Amino acid sequence: HTSDQHRWFQESRRSRDNPRADWYVWADPAPDGTPPNNWLSIFGGSAWQWEPRRGQYYLHNFLVSQPDLNYHNPAVAAQMLEECEFWLRRGVDGFRLDAINFCFHDPLLRSNPAKPPELRKGRGFSVDNPYAAQVHLYDNTRPEMLGFLERLRAVIDRYPQTMTLGEISSEDAIATVGEYTAGDKRLHSAYCFELLVDRFSTAHVREVIESLERRSPGYWPTWAIGNHDVARVASRWACPGVPTAARAKLLNAFLLSLKGSTCTYQGEELGLTEAELPLEALKDPYGIAFWPTFKGRDGCRTPMPWNDAAPQGGFSA
């Protein structure tokens, strides 16, 4: 997606016949004026927002202010590859691709089926989020993505010593990780939310590791036990009676002992805990929408303190 303030979207939303009219995902309303299907935003509510100037809805899998680009449009796909090459020419080492499986949607705009209550689980969203009540067959993780990843890899391979790392949240994230990294012609590596669960369980950790090795034997994994979307692991996996510092050392040792690469979220190596913030202090629209079951991401996005005993965390400004 882009911002709704981006010049591409500002042009696209003006009419149905401008040069960028098809650069975003636009759809006519249902006969009764409601959105074209039942797709939901992860951040709450419909994934469709009405635009009166076009008399159509636009798709936003995340915030209303983040309209989805239309990767089915060859001009959009080509432009995004050019954006990547722009930065590669400037010497970047590669790209971490956030929510990479959300680029493509079902062009027929079919509604997602319902998910049985016993199968609803949160991976990057809370279980009371209506998003958990659907099987996300049509709004993300579409087969067209594989071809685009191969085109992206062809661009990346022209620049030695660069790499791509994908973040994936899908119905079967381990399977998607395997598909998106298969054959040394798509992503170099990827990670999913399977170890970003709320509660620590030895059985779950073992199941995730063994499942990934069994189902994707040639895959070079990337592991993460924390990131900017979930509560800090020192708090999330806290153990009564075990000092935070000791547990943090154990968790870091565990992470670094796994086969593959690792992502360490800033402060994680120090055992930084979640900041407890009241509702009135939240800035994250995701947390405001789903308080108190999900308190948002502000608590894990605090700066890493230089000196926690000093004013302003030890920083001068």
For the regions a protein language model found, what residue spans apply to each?
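Acidic/aromatic-lined carbohydrate-recognition and catalytic surfaces
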Residues: 1-85, 89, 102-171, 304
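Reverse-transcriptase-like RNA-dependent polymerase core
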Residues: 311-317
